[in-house]
Swiss-Prot record:
Lineage, broadest ranks: Archaea, Nitrososphaerota, Nitrososphaeria, Nitrosopumilales, Nitrosopumilaceae
Enzyme Commission number, as recorded: 2.7.7.-
Oligomer status and interactors: Heterodimer of a small subunit (PriS) and a large subunit (PriL).
InterPro entries: DNA_primase_S, DNA_primase_ssu_PriS
Gene Ontology CC: DNA-directed RNA polymerase complex; primosome complex
Originating organism: Nitrosopumilus maritimus (strain SCM1)
Family, similarity comment: Belongs to the eukaryotic-type primase small subunit family.
Protein name (Swiss-Prot/TrEMBL): DNA primase small subunit PriS
Protein keywords: DNA replication, DNA-directed RNA polymerase, Magnesium, Manganese, Metal-binding, Nucleotidyltransferase, Primosome, Transcription, Transferase
């Protein structure tokens, strides 16, 4: 990214952190957290300890980071190297991202940027100008991406509350600022769980590794009465609703499952996992030393804010997370796909000078689809 673009983004971000600091969620037990940040065109700075909101505000104003992070873990010495921090416990965090959902819409709003000649083309594997295969993919997520991610959030929330006895008031959902959601679970029975236990939790939520015997099927002499019933709790109930369809079809479907045999039943379980298992990023939840994007901070992939979703159904990602200025900026835009922010449509642009609001200019510059003119 060139110096002019960096200065433009830093100016917009600094104005945000000066005017909108109340949107930053300063985490509880602040002094026990590890903070980190990145600057534009620079690496990560980690192992920072912050005492309170004043220190955090000072850090933001002095450094004007592209991205700000905070640990889900609590440490005795958060500013020391990892093996000296003395890990106490960690909040449970889940990451749901549209890019992991295999959505059919993805190809329609994904662009390929050539790292050799900087040509921008619609989702391709080879540059149309110089034939290079060194391409960077950029997505401009659509409403379907967000709506599909919301469905996964709802599935996750139901499992947490119904199966795992998590109090719904201890679950907080945040839009990531780009194309997904971060789900935080506080004060739960899982606070002191290590990576291995969290891995087992992930498998349960995603319905990974389910074995036929747990659902009534045996290699030898299976008993039809052992198969799940429609009204059972947890995954047995979900299995029943998905596989049988209705109570009246249970007997017929069980007969078919018995007839098809053990190996076929395993494929049925795999199908259940693929279709109704919650699609979370397992590595995020298992990592008890990770630092996460700070709620209320700007996501440098978009210029949008990681924001708390008080009402997930009504939440409009590309309106409710856009807080940058409406002031007009002239950019040289090469964005061949239309996008929508704050209920306004922008693009497509083909190597042309256009005047757009700052929030739209930042969005395109962050995605390498425009430069300051």
């Amino acid at each position: 990214m060139n110096e002019t673009d960096i200065k433009f983004l830093e100016s917009a971000f600094k104005k945000y952190y000066f005017e909108q600091f109340e949107l930053i969620r300063v985490p509880e037990r602040t002094s026990e957290r590890e903070f980190g940040y990145q600057k534009f065109n620079s690496g990560m700075t980690r192992h920072i300890s912050v005492k309170d909101d004043k220190e955090l505000h000072l850090l933001l104003m002095q450094n004007v980071p592209s991205d700000v992070y905070c640990s889900n873990a609590y440490y005795s010495f958060p500013n020391l190297p990892m093996n000296e921090k003395d890990w106490k416990e960690a909040d449970l965090i889940f990451d749901i991202d549209a890019k992991d959902l295999n959505l059919s819409c993805r190809g329609n709003h994904t662009l390929s940027i050539c790292n050799e000649c900087h040509e921008i083309s619609n989702n391709s594997e080879k540059c149309s100008k110089c034939n290079s295969t060194k391409l960077e993919k950029k997505s401009l997520p659509c409403k379907n991406c967000i709506d599909s991610s919301k469905i996964e959030v709802k599935k996750l929330s139901e499992i947490l509350t119904n199966d795992l006895s998590v109090n719904k008031d201890d679950i907080q959902v945040y839009f990531s600022g780009n194309e997904g959601f971060h789900i935080y679970v506080y004060n739960s029975q899982f606070q002191q769980n290590g990576s291995r236990e969290r891995s087992e939790l992930v498998d349960y939520i995603m319905f990974n590794g389910a074995i036929p015997e747990k659902f009534g099927m045996k290699k030898f002499k299976p008993n039809r009465n052992s198969f799940p019933d429609f009204d059972e709790a947890g995954w047995k109930g979900r299995f029943s609703k998905y596989v049988y369809g209705s109570k009246s079809k249970r007997s017929k479907i069980v007969s078919e499952l018995l007839s098809n045999g053990y190996s076929s039943f395993q494929k049925t379980l795999d199908d259940v996992s693929e279709n109704i298992g919650t699609k979370i990023d397992p590595n995020v939840t298992m990592d008890i030393h990770r630092i996460f994007r700070l709620p209320g901070s700007i996501n440098s992939k978009s210029g949008l804010t990681k924001i708390h979703c008080k009402d997930l159904v009504k939440f409009d990602a590309y309106v409710d997370s856009s807080f940058l200025s409406d002031d007009s900026v002239e950019v040289l835009a090469n964005c061949p796909i239309e996008f929508k922010l704050k209920n306004k449509k922008f693009g497509p642009y083909h190597n042309e000078k256009v005047s757009v609001p700052t929030f739209a200019a930042v969005y395109m510059v962050c995605k390498k689809l425009a430069t300051i003119a």
